[in-house]
């Protein structure tokens, strides 16, 4: 970064190290400003302190070293006082504070903003230090400023309390006011829930010297139990804040209640402790800004479909596996929402699909109604585009940080809500009915704000010019007086030219002298007697008059009074709006839900999605299903649809497990993800990319698609694969959907085949999970001849004399070739390598005995649900004695 020319750069001194820590200095020798800096820093030792000095926010000592490194700023030094020498210093311009603060917070730091809280001219006149105070404490989980937040993503702050195997979790997005808590007894479930939420910051209580320290992602600490992923940012908080009594009292006081029974957490002590500790942290970091949180809601993790981190990653729900980008994810493909709050809601829905068929059908009914009524759908979507992010706007209003533009945007949106209610008045589906009754007071409130504020208010409130004329009589009178003086100044130059006869006389202004009259030096002798000389320049003389200074004082006084009065009027208006924050946020939740469903109806129409029938039992019956992302990437008509039938149950001879074989790069992994995404979309309440679909609810989706070395934990690709597979076998049920791709490939062939066979057999006979098992071990096709609930499918190809054509069609039957050498040819391997590979493969196929005898003497077995191991008859197929 290149600093502005007026930034106080000085070369570091060579006699003393400017990078010293302040704790090793004699503070009495520091200048008064540095003494105050150190005093503030000791109050916030775990935050980076940005300290206002003129037009810059500066930092010193070790904070300067850290910030210069993280932000790539110039590290310089500044005189610290007699006998101290120079101290390390860097800084940022005041107008760039938000940008640089955001960068530091994104890197996992807490940032304390120490700003001037009085006019510097008053302090200068009294020859004292300008009064400064901490005005903001920014941490990763407590951001509210629009410029620091991702409009389409929640910024969650979480708190965790753990006792043995039991845990409590609370989380909130203070920019929207959402506040939830839960309690459970499985530490693995805690890790899954944190992985779903992806909180920006997690509070964890300890009783140790590291209190209030923030651990950046990846930073290790003995204070954190192994069950907590180290990929998050943790703030270590005092245990005393998280005691049950302290936490319960804080919740009762905050919500002005006598009991927590209405919140549903009365008998969940760990959930209460987590919620109370989180509340305390919000109060501590937000200072004078009271965050208007929504009522605390208690939920159970058993209410939703479980998606572990591996599944979310493999299904590419919010970001791609390859580069972590939004483009190419499921969310990218289906997010047609018109508002930021709708986009956030869609993300939450995708990461927390429903298990309740009634909730799913309620969403489907609304999508169906909007799909069948294109005019209504388009009118709703057009009206939604006119509505701002009222969820976060109401939060800033409630916290007292909203500016005039924020308030005007909120007001305009409140007025539009009445139009939206009118549009859905005839709706019959649940989510349309929810918006038919919008409080009339909200529209009146919006109209009141619009009537008070000018159409294009300035960004900063203290610039004035915010309130319309005719709102306040005193304000109008001050403005008239001010305008009279301004008009006098406008006419002064003409008047003085006529009075003096000096045609090149000018009336000007600067910050040093204020208003003055300028004459060329050649005309100085003609200056009237009432002109008082103030400054002589090379070609110019500058004068003032008694009347001019009197008028100037009137202007300065009037501006100050005007700005103060306008700010009072605006603040009062903002307080009135803040009283309606709960009602506004309740409506915002309904608007966001309607936005999501209208967007899903839109994509259902234009991408040809069908309404899935939510069936009882364990059924997955999809006809001509498509991958929602790949089909959009390829364009209309290019994607090859495929069907699937899974879920063996009475009256249906569908398999529980499909062995899927086929060539490399033929589309097996795409097919696996396609089935998983259709199941997920169905339980989100969305329509799905298929000709028709009949789908039962599943409790979990497991995926194991591809693996890489985990260098951080020293695990090989194969070990990562085995850990993921073990997790599936230990947690899957007959209501789960399991999608496996190439189990056992990271070890010797016999070992890999043995593991793959055993895993598939266990899934089919013991767990009876609905499973697609993609593999290049063609020997696994023999399972279908052994187990009644296993079927073979293959991704077909067309063989030509010198090449193969991928048809991307999934058909019954097992493949006996993987065409890996042909894939190598397509990738550009040298011809000599391809030819040699063909020779080697011929020899291997000729002499291999892996598959000999697999069909001999095997009677087809009907699996029986059991907690025991598969029968010996199933395992005896490898017995040499047979």
UniProtKB/Swiss-Prot annotation:
It comes from the Bacteria. ATP binds at residues 662-669. GO terms for molecular function: ATP binding; ATP-dependent DNA damage sensor activity; damaged DNA binding; mismatched DNA binding. InterPro entries: DNA_mismatch_repair_MutS (IPR005748), DNA_mismatch_repair_MutS-lik_N (IPR007695), DNA_mismatch_repair_MutS/MSH (IPR017261), DNA_mismatch_repair_MutS_C (IPR000432), DNA_mismatch_repair_MutS_clamp (IPR007861), DNA_mismatch_repair_MutS_core (IPR007696), DNA_mismatch_repair_MutS_N (IPR016151), DNA_mismatch_repair_MutS_sf (IPR036187). The keyword Metal-binding does not apply. GO terms for biological process: mismatch repair. The keyword Secreted does not apply. Keywords: ATP-binding, DNA damage, DNA repair, DNA-binding, Nucleotide-binding. SMART domains: MUTSac, MUTSd. Residues 1-22 are annotated as: Disordered. GO terms for cellular component: cytosol. CDD domains: ABC_MutS1. Belongs to the DNA mismatch repair MutS family. PANTHER family: DNA MISMATCH REPAIR PROTEIN MSH1, MITOCHONDRIAL, DNA MISMATCH REPAIR PROTEIN MUTS FAMILY MEMBER. NCBIfam families: mutS1, PRK05399.1. This protein is involved in the repair of mismatches in DNA. It is possible that it carries out the mismatch recognition step. This protein has a weak ATPase activity. This is DNA mismatch repair protein MutS. The lineage of its organism: Bacteria, Bacillati, Cyanobacteriota, Cyanophyceae, Oscillatoriophycideae.
